[in-house]
From Swiss-Prot:
HAMAP family cross-referenced by the UniProt entry: GTPase_Obg
Similarity annotation: Belongs to the TRAFAC class OBG-HflX-like GTPase superfamily. OBG GTPase family.
Pfam family of the protein (one): GTP1_OBG
Domain named OBG-type G: residues: 160-330
Organism in which the protein naturally occurs: Trichormus variabilis (strain ATCC 29413 / PCC 7937)
CDD domains: Obg
Main function: An essential GTPase which binds GTP, GDP and possibly (p)ppGpp with moderate affinity, with high nucleotide exchange rates and a fairly low GTP hydrolysis rate. Plays a role in control of the cell cycle, stress response, ribosome biogenesis and in those bacteria that undergo differentiation, in morphogenesis control.
PROSITE patterns: G_OBG (PS51710), GTP1_OBG (PS00905), OBG (PS51883)
Domain Obg: 1-159
The protein's name in its UniProt record: GTPase Obg
EC number: 3.6.5.-
Localization, UniProt: Cytoplasm
Amino acid sequence: MQFIDQAQIEVEAGKGGDGIVAFRREKYVPAGGPSGGNGGRGGSVVFVAVENLQTLLDFRYKHIFKADDGGRGGPNNCTGASGKDLIVQVPCGTTIYDAETGDLLGDLTQPNQQLLIAAGGKGGLGNQYFLSNRNRAPEYSLPGLPGERKLLRLELKLLAEVGIIGLPNAGKSTLISSLSAARPKIADYPFTTLIPNLGVVRKPTGDGTVFADIPGLIEGAADGAGLGHDFLRHIERTRVLLHLIDATSDDVIRDYNTIEQELQAYGRGLSERMQIVALNKIDAVDRETVDLDALATQLNHLSHAPVFLISAVTRTGLEPMLQEVWGILDQVNALEEAEVFR
């Protein structure tokens, strides 16, 4: 399935039904009063978040969404039928902006969460509404009002608790496939991963934690280089960052600093996010020429974060690293609960 994480669409709520001009025509009542009913309300456009969608792909093929118009009023003071609301399903994690003003309209993060995007127009008034002591037989009515119309920009930010970040070819896809049932495309060249991949990693308790393999970031990502903005956006909702570094690189410290500088430049608190650093591919390192422990110590001093020596291929060091992930997530959850009750 193709992964689409941005879309622009147009939505239009239904027009209110027209009020009508009608008069009572009953036997023995030759000059009945006005009885034209009001028009029905136009249908609204409502967005709802659902769990079974993972992409905005559907919006690539359909760009205009319109709710039903309200029905015309009827005789005998009957109000027209209301237009049916249009329910638009989006993935959990979808942020909705007004494309013309840039205003944030809503952020749908929970299953079944709903957001009224465009309200239906009010129904027009029938002539019975205008009956008065001065006008006993009004011969006019009002049309229904148009529904709201909006041009929207949709952005999907993945809902993952742990974001795996690093330079291209650091082994992120191999790691997520080792930890979960996810099977991303893996190859021995940079930029194999062009879309984020999600994998569910099970705790010893059986509970699942969602990890996101974020496509490789490059220098200048915060300025948009290499689709950097698109990729960095998916890190915003994560609680923990797992910074993966290729231990076979000719300059591990440079690689670490490159990613950290991009996180700081992008902002939105990414550089302050709880982090774990992992030196990957240690199975491919010549221990006689490379002092991995010394590199780990340097990274620890730089990052002030726990550093692990791992191999995603052989699974060496993965369990201790995961235990640290679970511990940090527990801390974050406890802090969030404390904030709620403060």
